[in-house]
């Protein structure tokens, strides 16, 4: 999943947020990852990030969404679906969180910037770009989604083709939205189970 879904599933727990944003930057076993300022709750956030991604990759609704894109985008379909689901979430944010999206996203940015010194330098460019560009709120608009896809295409050569995928979000919005509605409650249950397991352990 992409950033907004991930942050939603960390609740309002700053340490989980910080760990989650590290999820794509930490390779190998989480318990062996060391960095000054890293807490056990942040490690849990890294593992939560991995749990979200692993569950998402296998969910039938996500697989259906990928099949819409697969004839054109092949293995890149998953990356595009992740971004499209952030759009669905942002468009219908009030259904999922009591705080308005602009207030929520500014709170996330403040948390990340305030704790930048506790995070590895490799993640700093992502956080700075995300907050300066207001990516999370931008996902609510078609323009913001197109900008996100084009940015990914520029930053990651392997994803060079996805910059043109935005029109399919409009064309198939109702189908992506229905798949998201089926998927998100199941993902929330899995995240709750994971966090309960960590608390018991």
Regions picked out by a protein language model, each given a short descriptive name:
Residues 1-97, 169-201:
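An N-terminal structural lobe/cap that precedes and organizes the functional/catalytic core
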Residues 19-20, 98-102, 161-165:
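Short coil/turn segments at secondary-structure boundaries
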Residues 68-133:
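Active-site-proximal alpha-helical scaffolds that flank and shape metal-associated catalytic sites
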Residues 105-193:
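An amphipathic alpha-helical core segment
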């Amino acid at each position: 999943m992409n950033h907004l879904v991930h942050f939603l599933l960390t609740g309002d727990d700053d340490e989980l947020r910080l760990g989650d944003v590290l999820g794509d930057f930490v390779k190998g076993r989480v318990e062996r990852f060391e960095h000054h300022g890293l807490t056990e709750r942040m490690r849990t956030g890294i593992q939560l990030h991995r749990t979200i991604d692993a569950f998402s990759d296998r969910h039938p609704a996500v697989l259906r969404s990928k099949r819409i894109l697969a004839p054109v985008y092949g293995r890149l379909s998953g990356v595009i679906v992740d971004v499209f689901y952030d759009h669905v979430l942002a468009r219908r944010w009030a259904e999922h969180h009591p705080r308005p999206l602009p207030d929520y996203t500014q709170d996330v940015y403040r948390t990340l910037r305030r704790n930048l010194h506790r995070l590895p330098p490799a993640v700093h460019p992502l956080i700075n770009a995300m907050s300066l560009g207001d990516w999370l709120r931008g996902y609510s608009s078609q323009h913001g989604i197109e900008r996100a896809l084009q940015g990914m295409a520029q930053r990651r050569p392997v994803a060079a083709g996805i910059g043109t995928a935005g029109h399919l979000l409009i064309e198939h919005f109702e189908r992506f939205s229905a798949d998201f509605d089926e998927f998100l409650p199941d993902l929330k249950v899995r995240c709750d189970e994971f966090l309960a397991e960590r608390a018991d352990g």
